[in-house]
Amino acid sequence: LTKKFNIPLIFDEITVGWRVANGGFHKKIKINPDIAVFSKATSNGFPLGTIIGKKNIMKTAQNSFISSAYWTENIGFVAAISMIKFFIKNNVSKKLIHKGRSIKKIWKTVSKKYEVKIKISGLDPLPVFNFNYHEKNDEMMTYFTQEMLKLGFLAHGSCFIMLSHSNKLIKKYEKAFEVVFKKIFYILNNKKGKFKPLLKGRVKFAKFKNPV
């Protein structure tokens, strides 16, 4: 469609970044967009924004100048070079995908064992699960976070996989996840699914929603 109507194809790689493939998600699916945008994941958290693109598109920016608070700062560039070298040398994206699949498998296995209805989605290194109980979903996710916190995990339905997430840590997460889902199973079947009275704080709410 973009070619048909002569519209530049832009990939927002700010969230996906390098998690799926070296160089970005567009490398994984073998599409060369007109523009791809990356953020500080490229520099492992240091201030940096990256815009890459085809020559005929990028050359239009040569006559413009946009000031920035960090435009003279070199730390971000040095960090990015180091990160890219480390990422490629250690095949980080492959490891993130493997760890993410392990998390998805835990969710699927435990939820099936305790008959708790969830929906699993997201890319492997960015896995997401949501409860499937309609109006109870927010209460259940709040309870899940509350109980996981007691076991040492600041957890939610989304999981941003990191290289530092060791197999030992994932196993520990699995045990905690099962403990909490066993409680959820009990509440659903013996407490009429009433989670709100068990919460120590208010039910989670979405103050900001990404329109993308």
PLM region descriptions:
Residues 1-212:
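Conserved N-terminal phosphate-binding loop of PLP-dependent enzymes in the Aspartate aminotransferase
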